Amino acid sequence: MKHYNTKKLNREKDSWLYEISNSIVEPKKLLKFLHLEKYPKYYDSKPKKVFPFRVPYSFASRMKKNDPKDPLLLQVITKNQEFLNNLQFNEDPVKEKKDIVLPGLLHKYKDRVLWILKTNCAINCRYCFRKHFPYEKNKGNKKNWIQILHYISQNIELNEVILSGGDPLMAKDHELLWLITSLSKIKHIKRLRIHTRLPIVIPNRITSDLCQIFSNSVLKIIIVTHINHPQEINEQLSDSLLKLKKSNVILLNQSVLLKNINDNAIILAELSSRLCENNIIPYYLHILDKVKGTSHFLVSNKKAKSIISDLMKMISGFLVPRLVFDNGSKDNKLIII
């Protein structure tokens, strides 16, 4: 990965790039940072050869020291369980490959497309459902972007574009300005939805320039954050989320239900409360997509339903996310509750 000269970086604009370039890329280094050198049984470095290991320090700093069961650590640490063979788990659990119409563009639903804007992330979560996605054939470059814009302009039934990845906010501000300006010239496009985890792990990604881009856009901008545990929300993130709110951005959140991480109603109630405090609507709670190497994260449908049932007794209805599952064979996500 390219390392940036910090003397040349604009402190406000580019500090997030510095954080990415200086991320922790070795499991042992993260364990040392957390004073967990004596717990080698809790990780296996081999899985990082299949799916790279990457954790920014700003996210690692929210993990509890001396706690091998920290819920943030468990989302990112490599384990030999990733090599467990389970026939129910495969490399394309939501059957996305069949929906690729152009390099980087998926057209599954009639009125919207999903754009793989960038192929990398600031953090590599071990449960990621795209850990085996064919990114090499779907790279985010200007040539592909121009083809995608043409496709969108020619399909007038579309009214929404979803930016995904990787993480779409890995694109720099000037790239996003060009893209959003280009989309705003297509009259039938009304909404731009951005699915991202980057501001959660590196809050500095929400720059003043980015907020200005969102604020000036004629498109309705919706950002879907990926927050799984209340411990992920700190003061710095709250400040960045407030900037987005002031930029007329609609904020939603989706979480993944993860075994031994957030699979109880008390944690999810606290998460929904913290989200509400930060102007985010709890949107979806996903049953784990059965991607190869993630079976140790799976929470059964029966337990998931029980958790939601308990959650509904604890908090206001609007704070209860919809429990959903996507197996790729339906025209939409299956809403369980």
From Swiss-Prot:
Domain Radical SAM core: 107-322
Annotated EC: 5.4.3.-
GO molecular function: 4 iron, 4 sulfur cluster binding; isomerase activity; metal ion binding
Binding site for [4Fe-4S] cluster: C121, C125, C128
InterPro entries for this protein: Aldolase_TIM, EpmB, Lys_aminomutase/Glu_NH3_mut, rSAM
Cofactor(s) annotated in UniProt: [4Fe-4S] cluster; pyridoxal 5'-phosphate
Keyword list, A-Z: 4Fe-4S, Iron, Iron-sulfur, Isomerase, Metal-binding, Pyridoxal phosphate, S-adenosyl-L-methionine
N6-(pyridoxal phosphate)lysine: modified positions: K333
Top-rank EC class of the record's enzyme: isomerase
Catalytic activity: L-lysine = D-beta-lysine
PROSITE patterns documented for this protein: RADICAL_SAM
Cofactor note: Binds 1 [4Fe-4S] cluster. The cluster is coordinated with 3 cysteines and an exchangeable S-adenosyl-L-methionine.
Superkingdom: Bacteria
Family indicated by similarity: Belongs to the radical SAM superfamily. KamA family.
PANTHER family: L-LYSINE 2,3-AMINOMUTASE, LYSINE 2,3-AMINOMUTASE-RELATED
Function: With EpmA is involved in the beta-lysylation step of the post-translational modification of translation elongation factor P (EF-P) on 'Lys-34'. EpmB appears to act before EpmA. Displays lysine 2,3-aminomutase activity, producing (R)-beta-lysine from (S)-alpha-lysine (L-lysine).
Protein name in UniProt: L-lysine 2,3-aminomutase
High-level lineage: Bacteria, Pseudomonadati, Pseudomonadota, Gammaproteobacteria, Enterobacterales
